C-alpha cells in the first residue's frame, strides 16, 4: 500500500505552499527487514548447531561397570567417531558433554557436581545405565538415586548395563535436540550498544520439577 505524505513549505512563493511525496508503508518496510533478519538468524543458528552436534567432545569419566560398555563404543566395531564424538578429553574445561556411566555414590556426588560446573557452556549430560538414571538395584544410603538429583540430565540411556548401540542411540538423540536449540550465539550488537545475553536453559529451569516427579510419596503422606 502506498502512502502520500504532504509536507507544508512555508517558504514557498507559489501555490500550493506544500510538497506531496508518495512513500511505501513504513510497517511493510519493517516487516521485510525483520523477516530478512529472522531468516538470517535462523541460518546462523542452524550452522552453529550443526557444528556443535558434530563436534561433541566427551569427558572421560566413568563411575562403574557401564564405563566398559562406553569404552566399547570407541572400538572399530562401533566406531563412535562416525558421530564426531571420539575426541575424549581428560579435562572438563575442554569437554562439552559428560557421560555419567555407572553408579553415583554419595562420596562421588560432590566430585561429579564440581566437574560439571567446570565445563564451559554449551554443555550436555548423558546418564548411562540404570544406576545413573535412578540408582538401579542399589536402594541404599550410599548411592544417589539418580544423577539428576545433583546435575541436570539431557538424555537417559536405560539398561544394566546398556549395550553400546543404546549409547549411540542416546548420542543421536542428543544431536537431534542440539539442532533445535536456540542458544545465544555470543555478543549481540543492537541500537543500544553491545551486550551478551544470559539465558538459562529450559533443562535447568525444570530441574526441580523433574526431581519432584521422581520423589515418590510414602503411604503415610497420601
UniProtKB/Swiss-Prot annotation:
Residues 201-212 have a biased composition (Basic and acidic residues). Coiled coil: none annotated. Its cofactor is [4Fe-4S] cluster. Gene3D superfamilies: 3.40.50.12280. Keywords: 4Fe-4S, Cell inner membrane, Cell membrane, Iron, Iron-sulfur, Membrane, Metal-binding, NAD, Quinone, Translocase, Transport, Ubiquinone. PROSITE patterns: COMPLEX1_20K. It catalyses: a quinone + NADH + 5 H(+)(in) = a quinol + NAD(+) + 4 H(+)(out). InterPro entries: NADH_UbQ_OxRdtase-like_20kDa, NADH_UQ_OxRdtase_20Kd_su. Pfam families: Oxidored_q6. It is a peripheral membrane protein. [4Fe-4S] cluster binds at residues 65-66, 131, 160. GO terms for biological process: aerobic respiration; electron transport coupled proton transport. Its main location: membrane. GO terms for cellular component: plasma membrane; respiratory chain complex I. It comes from the Bacteria. One of its GO terms (molecular function) is 4 iron, 4 sulfur cluster binding. Its EC number is 7.1.1.-. It is found in: Cell inner membrane. Binds 1 [4Fe-4S] cluster. Residues 200-222 are annotated as: Disordered. Disulfide bonds: none annotated. It is an enzyme of class 7 (translocase). NDH-1 shuttles electrons from NADH, via FMN and iron-sulfur (Fe-S) centers, to quinones in the respiratory chain. The immediate electron acceptor for the enzyme in this species is believed to be ubiquinone. Couples the redox reaction to proton translocation (for every two electrons transferred, four hydrogen ions are translocated across the cytoplasmic membrane), and thus conserves the redox energy in a proton gradient. NDH-1 is composed of 14 different subunits. Subunits NuoB, C, D, E, F, and G constitute the peripheral sector of the complex. Belongs to the complex I 20 kDa subunit family. This is NADH-quinone oxidoreductase subunit B. It comes from Psychrobacter arcticus (strain DSM 17307 / VKM B-2377 / 273-4). The gene is nuoB.
Amino acid at each position: 500500500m502506498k502512502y502520500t505524505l504532504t509536507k507544508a513549505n512555508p517558504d514557498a512563493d507559489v501555490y500550493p505552499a506544500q510538497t506531496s511525496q508518495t512513500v511505501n508503508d513504513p510497517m511493510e518496510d519493517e516487516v521485510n527487514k525483520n523477516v530478512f533478519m529472522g531468516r538470517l538468524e535462523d541460518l546462523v543458528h542452524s550452522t552453529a548447531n550443526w557444528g556443535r552436534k558434530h563436534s561433541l567432545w566427551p569427558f572421560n569419566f566413568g563411575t562403574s561397570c557401564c564405563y566398559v560398555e562406553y569404552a566399547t563404543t570407541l572400538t572399530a566395531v562401533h566406531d563412535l567417531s562416525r558421530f564426531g564424538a571420539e575426541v575424549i578429553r581428560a579435562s572438563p574445561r575442554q569437554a562439552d558433554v559428560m557421560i555419567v556411566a555407572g553408579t553415583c555414590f554419595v562420596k562421588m556426588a560432590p566430585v561429579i557436581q564440581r566437574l560439571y560446573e567446570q565445563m564451559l557452556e554449551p554443555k550436555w549430560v548423558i546418564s548411562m545405565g540404570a544406576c545413573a538414571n535412578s540408582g538401579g538395584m542399589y536402594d541404599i544410603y550410599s548411592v544417589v538415586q539418580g544423577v539428576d538429583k545433583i546435575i541436570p540430565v539431557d538424555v537417559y540411556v536405560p539398561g544394566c548395563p546398556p549395550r553400546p548401540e543404546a549409547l549411540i542411540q542416546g548420542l543421536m538423540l542428543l544431536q537431534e535436540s542440539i539442532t533445535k536449540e536456540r542458544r545465544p550465539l555470543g555478543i549481540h550488537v543492537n541500537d543500544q550498544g553491545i551486550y551478551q545475553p544470559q539465558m538459562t536453559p529450559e533443562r535447568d529451569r525444570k530441574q526441580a520439577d523433574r526431581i519432584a516427579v521422581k520423589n515418590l510419596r510414602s503411604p503415610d503422606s497420601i
